[in-house]
Swiss-Prot record:
PANTHER family: NUCLEOID-ASSOCIATED PROTEIN YBAB (PTHR33449:SF1). GO terms for cellular component: bacterial nucleoid; cytosol. One of its GO terms (molecular function) is DNA binding. This is Nucleoid-associated protein RPE_4812. The lineage of its organism: Bacteria, Pseudomonadati, Pseudomonadota, Alphaproteobacteria, Hyphomicrobiales. Belongs to the YbaB/EbfC family. Gene3D superfamilies: Nucleoid-associated protein YbaB-like domain. It comes from Rhodopseudomonas palustris (strain BisA53). Homodimer.
Length: 105
């Protein structure tokens, strides 16, 4: 019975830490950059896009494909950085065990 109560207490502590972690991940922001800074994407560590900045020189109707490629690249860069930030925060919660790739909170 004492083991069960201990497990329940640990589960409650883990749940509390997870809520705290969610809040921290929401506050962490990363920036994805492409085209030497022509396109920037700001994203939370929870993978929520917060802002997109596009240099006006890319707003040429004849170059839409270039803008699309740079935007995809900046989003991918931001996503990689957000995933790394999430992994780093999860290591503190799990005592150094890393989260399997693609497993988010």
């Amino acid at each position: 019975m004492a083991d069960f109560l201990g497990m329940m207490k640990q589960a409650a502590q883990l749940q509390s830490k997870m809520k705290e972690m969610q809040s921290e991940l929401d506050r962490i922001e990363v920036e994805g950059i492409s085209g030497g800074g022509l396109v920037n994407v700001r994203m939370s560590a929870k993978m929520e896009v917060r802002a997109v900045k596009i240099d006006p020189s890319l707003l040429n109707p004849d170059e839409v494909g270039v803008l699309e490629d740079l935007l995809v690249s900046a989003l991918a860069d931001a996503h990689r950085k957000a995933e790394a930030a999430m992994q780093d925060k999860m290591k503190t919660l799990t005592g150094g065990l890393s989260l399997p790739p693609g497993l988010g909170l």
